[in-house]
Amino acid sequence: MAKRHYIPITADVPGVNEGQRAFIRKVIRTALAAEGVDFPCEVDVLLTNDEAIHQINLDMREVDRATDVLSFPEFDLQPGELPGEEDADPGTGLVPLGDMVISMEHVAAQAKEYGHSNRRELAYLVVHSCLLYTSPSPRDTR
């Protein structure tokens, strides 16, 4: 079976266009390929604002502040482990890797702070989130 990832992107903030969605999908596919993910998988993305990510952070992690990106991996992996096709949802044939939530307000603020483009900052946050699905590390460090 050919590798085909499913990457739905929901935006509850204005100004997110199809070009940005395509860019995010490309970054995710590239990061997963670099990590050796060679099976069809699903990654769900929510693009939101500081207020919403603050509430999600509080509800899910009991951290009372906004942040740039949140990652919710589907699997609790050990170093060197990857989920595999045996973990696929029987209904879709896709391995659900997890969810990522990105504050577009933080993207803009951090891009300005670090002196680079919003696009570069968005790519950085997307890759950072993807690595938590494939390279286990402490999940509450960021």
Over which residues does each language-model region extend?
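Active-site His/Glu-centered metal-binding helix of metallohydrolases
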Residues: 122, 126-131
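Single conserved hydrophobic/aromatic residue that forms the stacking wall/gate
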Residues: 133-142
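An acidic/histidine-cluster motif and surrounding catalytic segment
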Residues: 1-122, 135
